[in-house]
From Swiss-Prot:
Belongs to the adenylosuccinate synthetase family. HAMAP family: Adenylosucc_synth. Its EC number is 6.3.4.4. GO terms for molecular function: adenylosuccinate synthase activity; GTP binding; magnesium ion binding. It comes from Synechococcus sp. (strain RCC307). Its main location: cytoplasm. This is Adenylosuccinate synthetase. Pathway: Purine metabolism; AMP biosynthesis via de novo pathway; AMP from IMP: step 1/2. InterPro entries: Adenylosuccin_syn_GTP-bd, Adenylosuccin_syn_Lys_AS, Adenylosuccinate_synth_dom1, Adenylosuccinate_synth_dom2, Adenylosuccinate_synth_dom3, Adenylosuccinate_synthetase, P-loop_NTPase. Gene3D superfamilies: Adenylosuccinate Synthetase, subunit A, domain 1, Adenylosuccinate Synthetase, subunit A, domain 2, Adenylosuccinate Synthetase, subunit A, domain 3. Substrate binds at residues 298-304. It comes from the Bacteria.
Length: 437
């Protein structure tokens, strides 16, 4: 048995969906432990493109149990839409389980999220506008609604009437928006409760039952380390904890249940939204990475900012998450470049620094210190083993492994499942007997 956490080692969008899908073949249970519909992952199976925001990637395997844990925030309308989409593609998701204690995103959360972001003006954060921050805010203020509350219409009415009245005051007085009709909202969410009732369970109990039965459990994070509320580039972060420790809180397990942690990182770096980005590129190189990598957000459709691989934030992600190994994705995007740069340190106010600064103003002043490596200028898309890779591509991977001080277990060379090199099974294989410098 092995219980594994998969996290993003950058600013999200690293390709965790594909890696989780790949690892789900060896998992009995897959748990999504934080985030909401602000995250998205794309899976390509036999040329079929599936885009999911809430449902774990493991749903494509009929023998894998998928759980949406307590640390997530659930938009029931989106969840029902994903279930319908899967059904239309002949994928059975009837076994999906949603934590009864997961908090619910409501219409006023979305409206407030969008209004607050607009009001920030030049200080905007880059929120997706899906209501995630306000949902987590209500959770922290102990005024939120949980999935279990949707199952009892009378309780739902009691729990919603006060908050709707209070949020309507905010919408009207602060933002000049029309108020919500309380009866319409209550009726809508009572209907969601009826339609989702068969999926709502005590997920923490289900996870511990699986652990006692010595099942393989895969914990799937959303977003990435640098978007973590406590450890990311605050305030340009999400409202939850994507780091490995967040799996324990969001799933309701102790750290001793986790056997290993896998970090997913692109062979370059991207970021959506606002905030400092030391290795960001502009012009034709940025356009090349964006076009070759299809760098447009699954959730928002926004173009992602692109830059060179940043080893400083990479090492920080290794430390914060206790990474055992890495999955490097989109190596093929670099195939046509004659030179590739990698950030190995920063220069801050004339001093070389090797660490990620906690101060946002300091991080904004950091200039990258690059090392330049030769490109391989040949396609890697059809490579299926390390021996198939060009030597310069292998040298690049070894350089990243040495820089990050952690071995590489998986190399992804395209969106499809088969465009993958598994150096060593990161679930069942020996720790650290993988690709390293």
């Amino acid at each position: 048995m092995a219980n594994v956490v998969v996290i993003g080692a950058q600013w999200g969008d690293e390709g965790k969906g594909k890696i989780t899908d790949l690892l789900s073949r060896s998992a009995d249970v897959v748990v999504r432990y934080q985030g909401g519909v602000n995250a998205g992952h794309t899976i390509v199976v036999d040329g079929q493109v599936l885009k999911l925001h809430l449902i774990p990637s493991g749903i494509l395997y009929p023998d894998t149990t998928c759980l949406i844990g307590s640390g997530t925030v659930v938009d029931p309308k989106v969840l029902l839409g994903e279930l319908a989409m899967l059904a239309s593609n002949d994928i059975d998701a009837s076994g999906l389980k949603v934590a009864s204690t997961a908090h619910v995103t409501l219409p006023y959360h979305r409206l407030l999220d969008q209004a607050m972001e607009q009001q920030r003006g030049n200080q905007r954060i880059g929120t997706t506008g899906r209501g995630i921050g306000p949902t987590y805010s209500d959770k922290a203020e102990r005024s939120g609604l949980r999935m279990i509350d949707l199952l009892d219409e009378q309780l739902l009415r009691e729990r919603l009437q006060g908050p709707i009245a209070a949020k309507n005051l905010q919408l009207q007085k602060l933002y000049g928006l029309e108020p919500l009709d309380a009866e319409e909202v209550i009726a809508e969410y009572a209907d969601y409760g009826r339609r989702l009732s068969s999926h709502v369970v005590d997920c923490t109990r289900a996870i511990h039952d699986a652990a006692r039965a010595r099942k393989n459990i895969l914990f799937e994070g959303a977003q990435g380390t640098l978007l973590d509320l406590d450890h990311g580039t605050y305030p340009y972060v999400t409202s939850s904890n994507p780091v490995a420790g967040g799996a324990c809180i969001g799933a309701g397990v102790g750290p001793t249940l986790i056997d290993r942690v896998i970090g997913v990182a692109k062979a370059y770096t991207t970021r959506v939204g606002e905030g400092p980005f030391p290795t960001e590129l502009e012009g034709s190189l940025s356009d090349h990475l964006c076009d070759r990598g299809g760098e447009y957000g699954t959730t928002t459709g926004r173009r992602r900012r692109c830059g060179w691989f940043d080893g400083v934030i990479g090492r920080y992600a290794v430390e914060v998450n206790g990474l055992d190994c890495l999955a490097i994705t989109k190596l093929d995007v670099l195939d046509e470049l004659d030179e590739i740069q990698v950030c190995v340190a920063y220069e801050l106010d004339g001093q070389r620094v090797n660490h990620f600064p906690s101060s946002a103003s300091e991080f904004a002043r950091c200039q990258p210190v690059f090392e330049t490596l030769p490109g391989w200028q040949t396609s890697t898309a059809d490579c299926r083993s390390l021996d198939d890779l060009p030597e310069k591509a292998m040298s690049y991977l070894r350089f990243l492994a040495d820089l990050m001080e952690v071995p590489i277990a998986i190399v992804s060379l395209g969106a499809s499942r088969d465009q993958t090199i598994v150096v060593e099974d990161p679930i069942h294989g020996p720790k650290r007997a993988l690709l390293s410098a």
